[in-house]
Design a protein with these regions (language model features):
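An amphipathic alpha-helix signature
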Residues: 21, 25, 42, 46-54, ...
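Helix-loop "lid/cap" segments that line or gate small-molecule binding pockets
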Residues: 27-28, 48-63, 120, 152-153
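Generic enzyme active-site microenvironment
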Residues: 6-8, 109, 166
């Protein structure tokens, strides 16, 4: 039986792609850059917002200075609009409630910046107690570096073999492998099944409810 389930946020618990896309496009437009269709952002997100901005900027403009300029426009806009169109994926709220009632610890490990991670989790899952809600924190490497998982394990006081890590991207599968914990790839998120399969996770699922069987 697993004692702790760690979930990625964007593309796993919440479909946030529209709000991320609209906010990035707002920032790009403010600075005179070309914007992108929402669907293209599926392959830009996942490695933190600075990497998102670098990918969104046109060739020849991908400098650190320009990334920071986009970030300056993005943050205040996204902080207001990050829950406009974002929604939990089907079955997620019921799954979290089930795990909580069964006494399983629940945590979030995201590459989204910390303030937005906390806000979205509190907004969409107010009835759920999370052992940890960690986003991108200053001085801590982003996923697939396993530090975020190790920090959660310390708070939860569990062993690696007692953990299931659930995510929708290759970054998540690599994070689980780097941390030495069991991985479950979910196919309803931003990345295709083929990307998940490259990392040979212990589990893959198309339906949130099936995660219950991986816990017990």
């Amino acid at each position: 039986m697993k004692k702790l389930i760690i979930f990625d946020l964007d593309g796993t618990l919440l479909n946030t792609i529209a709000d991320l896309a609209h906010s990035t496009n707002y920032a790009l437009n403010k600075l005179g850059y070309t914007t992108h269709d929402v669907e293209k952002y599926n392959f830009m997100v996942g490695n933190g917002i600075n990497k998102l901005f670098e990918r969104a900027l046109p060739e020849g403009e991908k400098t650190e200075e320009n990334v920071l300029r986009v970030r300056k426009e993005f943050i205040p806009y996204y902080d207001i609009h990050n829950a406009d169109d974002s929604r939990p994926y089907p079955g997620i709220s019921a799954l979290l409630s089930y795990l909580q009632s069964a006494g399983i610890q629940i945590a979030v490990a995201s590459n989204k910046y910390q303030a937005a991670t906390e806000k979205l989790v509190a907004h969409y899952f107010p009835e759920i107690h999370f052992t940890a809600v960690f986003g991108q924190r200053e001085g801590v490497n982003v996923k697939p570096d396993p530090t975020i998982v190790f920090d959660i394990l310390k708070l939860a006081d569990v062993r690696k073999e007692d953990v299931l890590y659930v995510g929708d991207s290759g970054v998540d599968m690599q994070t689980a492998a780097n941390a030495g914990v069991t991985a479950c790839g979910v196919t309803w998120g931003f990345r295709p099944r083929t990307e998940l399969e490259e990392f040979n996770p212990a589990y893959m699922t198309d339906v949130a409810e099936k995660i219950k069987k991986m816990v017990f």
